[in-house]
Amino acid sequence: MKQYKILLFIADGLGDRPVTKLEHKTPLEAVEKPNIGELLKNSIAGLMDPISPGIVPGSDTSHLAIFGIDPFKYYRGRGAFEAIGAGARLKAGDVAFRGNFATVDNNLTVIDRRAGRKVDEAKDLVQELNSKIGEIDGVQVKFYHGTEHRVAVVLSGKGLSDKISDTDPHETGVKVKKSEATDDTREAKITAEVLNKLTNRIYDILSSSELNKKRIERGELPANIVLLRGAAQYVDLPKFYDYTKINAAAVSATALIKGICSQIGMNVVTPKGATGGLDTNYIGKAEEASKLLKEYDMVFLHLKATDAASHDGNIDGKLYAISMIDKMIGRVLDIYGSELIIAITGDHATPVEVKEHTGDPVPFLLYVPYNIVADNVDDFNEKQLRKGSLRIKGLDVINLLLNYSYRYEKFGA
């Protein structure tokens, strides 16, 4: 039996709800998608619960599930994935965090959790922090830039713990939180103390940074703090090839996703101009995926722009990103052709009016290039896909891909 190549396209935060300004259509309903519409004619489709109905997924736990890795068994926290994706090489005992460059006032009250989101000086600020903070109380500290305002921090030393709380309050108008131990161990208490000292040191350095003085002169918010969250120690994950026998590559610009994919053994490629934002190189990513399909059994293509727009409440931005998804699919079909399996879905819903993740199911489409009993679905959107035959969980996705690509192993005799 011929085995087919696989394209798995995940648009971050794709799922949505009816939007008042769109005459109560969802963003997917409001955008014409001719290329995806053609795929629907020979697809099975429906809705997917990334974790389980009603559970609000993080992008980390949902991607693990979609890749066939049970997050309830393996998930320890997001920080390690972010750090690996940003270029860190973690070792046992290290504690990693994800963070944002943010803006606070003199009392450490948060004004903007993302410092206006646009922090062109982020790499230079990271370099400045690394040059001025080598260690805190004997614990080695290293900063890594991710994308835009995002940063990862790694603590290295003996006797550290990831059982500590965030310094990020997750809202504005309140003070930066003090990290606290979440268990009674000495290691957790020491790590929380180090993190609090680190936070104060970061503020002192960034507040006096010439780079931030220039930002203020330009009328921009200073990036004068790093809000930290998602403490996690390194955990070995199953390798994708070991449980699928599929050689896979990933196309992504997002540190978290790059970290997960790297850790499970995918070859990660970030094309020139891919940013993880609305200004990303959409077509360049599609072209890179098409090229990789000639070399690998499966290519995972990730797009962050839909989620970024949703978190900002940017309706027009989400509509634009969705229109570009259709163009990306069209570009893959132009270059590689249609003789492959294509799955299109989201990792979670981020309704543009809510601006946060929700536990809503997300759209799911699986196109095959041969005769199947296709679903009678007219459009790729949240309402139409309720007519489809599928209501699956994230952990089901890999099995579906293996089955329809004829790469499965029989269960039983």
Curated annotation (Swiss-Prot):
**Which Gene3D superfamilies does the record match to this protein?**
Alkaline Phosphatase, subunit A
Q: Which UniProt keywords are given for this protein, alphabetically ordered?
A: Glycolysis, Isomerase
EC assignment: 5.4.2.12
Query: Which class of enzymes does this protein belong to?
Result: isomerase
Segment forming the signal sequence: none
- Molecular-function GO term, any one: metal ion binding
Which Pfam family is an annotated match for this chain, by its short name?
PhosphMutase
Q: Name one GO biological process term.
A: glycolytic process
Record field: catalytic activity: (2R)-2-phosphoglycerate = (2R)-3-phosphoglycerate
Q: In which pathway does it act?
A: Carbohydrate degradation; glycolysis; pyruvate from D-glyceraldehyde 3-phosphate: step 3/5
Task: Name the family the entry cites.
Answer: Belongs to the BPG-independent phosphoglycerate mutase family. A-PGAM subfamily.
Function recorded in the entry: Catalyzes the interconversion of 2-phosphoglycerate and 3-phosphoglycerate.
Cited HAMAP family: ApgM_A
Q: Which protein are we looking at?
A: 2,3-bisphosphoglycerate-independent phosphoglycerate mutase
